[in-house]
A protein has these predicted regions:
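Beta-rich strand-turn-strand
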Residues: 47-83
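Short acidic, glycine-rich loop/turn motifs
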Residues: 32-36, 77
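Acidic, gly/ser/pro-rich intrinsically disordered tails
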Residues: 1, 14-21, 37, 41, ...
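Short aromatic-glycine-enriched beta-strand elements
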Residues: 18-32, 84
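OB-fold and OB-like beta-barrel modules that bind single-stranded nucleic acids
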Residues: 4-12, 30, 60-71, 90-93
Length: 109
């Protein structure tokens, strides 16, 4: 089983990209507290409708719970050096706490 749940805050606004096959994907990073003084930064990918919702409602600083699966992929750079990327493929996104913006808008998740 490959399931992960993370609680963290967005480090910047969501960015929409397109895969080589033309699929839309929202990308963002959350900071997850390791302890009081340290955090780890996790890259998140949200595809299709979930990605569109993320782009519309998630902003820098927003606290969220991400439920998804861990993904590790590799690629070669221009010099032929292999790199590994660890990221989470989001299946669900939940808001934590309240913000004034949340009170004004009805959220679809």
């Amino acid at each position: 089983m490959n399931k992960i749940e993370l609680l963290g805050r967005l480090t910047k606004d969501v960015e929409m990209k397109q895969t080589k096959t033309g699929k839309k994907v929202a990308t963002f990073t959350i900071a997850v507290a390791k302890n009081k003084e340290n955090a780890i930064f996790i890259n998140i990918l949200a595809f299709d409708k979930l990605g569109e919702i993320a782009e519309k409602y998630l902003k820098k600083g927003r606290q969220v719970v991400i439920v998804g699966s861990l993904n590790i992929r590799d690629y070669e750079d221009k010099e032929g050096k292999k790199h590994y990327v660890t990221e989470v493929l989001a299946e669900n996104i939940y808001f934590v706490g309240n913000s004034k913006q949340d009170e004004k808008e009805e959220l679809p998740f």
